[in-house]
């Protein structure tokens, strides 16, 4: 060898150094677009779920606290309107309370779907339970909407009088609760 030349000496790796290294046989794994899409849908689902829970809770509270008393001639003789005077409104309060409870309790499962977007089990369970609660919320809101319509307009064929001329505050609160329930139905569907 001459002065300017250098030579490389190869030293074999010990068995300790080789254990921690794996040979590179595959290319780097790219970003999975399907998982990103599912994560985005799950985030949107969580936002809608929280919105529906808020609307359902508001509808339940407003309907459950609705009452109005009208004095008639004296203080001892009064007309009183409460939500529980009509079984449809009682069904509304119970049904929307169940929907609210489910929507609040399903938020953690929705978060699991965000963290693990490819998990099929939690997503399927949410779809089935969401369908059941959407039907319950729709039936509660629809039946109450029919009674609110009768309260506003009456039915001359059945000789039912409109009561909203006398119980204006009661009718306004009940109408607001029904609108909030339909908002919850749209958000939870």
Swiss-Prot record:
Coiled coil: none
Subcellular location: Cell membrane
Membrane-related topology note: Multi-pass membrane protein
Topology Extracellular: residue spans: 64-90, 152-189
Topological domains, Cytoplasmic: 1-42, 112-130
Transmembrane segments: 43-63, 91-111, 131-151
Domain of life: Eukaryota
Short name of one Pfam family: CASP_dom
GO biological process, any: cell wall organization
Keywords for this protein: Cell membrane, Cell wall biogenesis/degradation, Membrane, Transmembrane, Transmembrane helix
GO cellular component: plasma membrane
Main location: membrane
Function: Regulates membrane-cell wall junctions and localized cell wall deposition. Required for establishment of the Casparian strip membrane domain (CSD) and the subsequent formation of Casparian strips, a cell wall modification of the root endodermis that determines an apoplastic barrier between the intraorganismal apoplasm and the extraorganismal apoplasm and prevents lateral diffusion.
Quaternary structure and interacting proteins, as annotated: Homodimer and heterodimers.
PANTHER family xrefs: CASP-LIKE PROTEIN, CASP-LIKE PROTEIN 1U1
Similarity remark: Belongs to the Casparian strip membrane proteins (CASP) family.
Name under which the protein is recorded: Casparian strip membrane protein 1
């Amino acid at each position: 060898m001459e002065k300017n030349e250098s030579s490389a000496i190869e030293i074999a790796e010990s068995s300790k150094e080789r254990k921690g290294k794996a040979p590179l046989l595959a290319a780097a794994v790219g970003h999975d677009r399907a998982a990103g899409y599912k994560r985005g849908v799950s985030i949107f689902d969580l936002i809608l779920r929280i919105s529906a829970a808020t609307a359902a809770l508001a509808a339940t509270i407003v309907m459950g606290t609705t009452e109005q008393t009208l004095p008639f001639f004296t203080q001892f003789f009064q007309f009183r309107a409460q939500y529980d005077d009509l079984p449809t409104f009682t069904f509304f309060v119970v049904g929307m309370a169940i929907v609210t409870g489910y929507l609040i309790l399903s938020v953690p499962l929705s978060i699991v779907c965000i963290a693990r977007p490819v998990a099929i089990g939690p997503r399927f369970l949410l779809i089935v339970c969401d369908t059941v609660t959407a039907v319950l919320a729709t039936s509660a809101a629809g039946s109450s909407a029919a009674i609110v319509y009768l309260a506003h307009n009456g039915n001359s064929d059945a000789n039912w009088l409109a009561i909203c001329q006398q119980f204006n505050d009661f009718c306004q609160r009940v109408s607001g609760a029904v609108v909030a329930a339909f908002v919850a139905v749209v958000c939870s569907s």
